[in-house]
Regions:
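N-terminal leader/linker segments that initiate helical-solenoid repeat arrays
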Residues: 43-92
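Terminal, low-structured helical/coil segments at or just beyond the last alpha-helical repeat
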Residues: 50, 61, 70, 77-81, ...
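Bacterial N-terminal signal peptides
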Residues: 29-40
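Alpha-helical adaptor scaffolds
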Residues: 84-156
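Residue-level signature of tetratricopeptide-repeat
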Residues: 127-128, 161, 195
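Register position in tetratricopeptide repeats
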Residues: 99, 133-134, 167-168, 200-204
Length: 207
């Protein structure tokens, strides 16, 4: 656990220096988002936590950007939590591999995590992220859909599926998933920009 906390501190400093604009469609952006979400991680719950319902209601209803950011961070905090030390270890090793851009190794660690905790939504979401970075979009889609089966409110997975659809130039699919993400969390500027991009590309494809 101490190693995990030290890693989060190091990642925060790296992120402050190197974070890319959220609306760019690059591997660096996705890694920046991944590590940003990691900063609020703990180890004692998951997507079934009873605190989430009220947080989602507050996130959707607030018009205050600062408050929305707080609610969103709390949701990610809970999603990242888990009680099992083996799951925690697999998550740590997967994150460490991603930090070194060792995506195949990260895939192995997150696959072990999924084997240990097949009903832990964030495990599937993390492996989906690695698969996206490896360019294995169809496999990434499958893991995203499993994430959504376990946590239908996972706006991160929905927006991630939107990015996959953009990569595949499936503009209709991209629009659907990005809109779905914004229905749950309407405050994601990067997703709003991605949606505008997908709509523009769809319009161009029809002319």
């Amino acid at each position: 656990m101490k190693q995990f906390l030290r890693l989060r501190s190091k990642l925060f400093l790296i992120l402050l220096k190197n974070m890319k604009p959220i609306y760019t469609f690059t591997k660096n952006w996705l890694l920046s988002l991944f590590f940003l979400l990691l900063l609020t991680a703990s180890v004692f719950a998951d997507q079934n936590d009873v605190r989430l319902a009220e947080l989602f209601r507050s996130l959707k209803s607030t018009e205050n950007v600062s408050r929305a950011s707080v609610f969103e961070s709390k949701i990610w905090h809970i999603w990242m939590e888990h009680y099992d030390p083996e799951v925690e270890s697999a998550m740590f090793q997967g994150v460490e591999a991603m930090k070194l851009q060792q995506y195949e190794q990260a895939f192995g660690h997150f696959s072990l995590l999924i084997k240990l905790a097949p009903d832990y939504a964030e495990g599937w979401n993390k492996r989906a992220t690695v698969l996206y970075l490896l360019g294995r979009f169809k496999e990434s889609e499958a893991d995203v859909m499993r994430t959504l089966e376990l946590e239908p409110r996972h706006f991160g997975a929905l927006s991630g599926q939107g990015l996959i659809k953009i990569a595949l130039q499936d503009w209709t699919g991209a629009i659907y998933f990005l809109e779905s993400a914004l229905k749950i969390n309407p405050h994601m500027y990067g997703v709003i920009m991605n949606l505008k991009y997908a709509r523009q590309k769809q319009k161009e494809s029809m002319t």
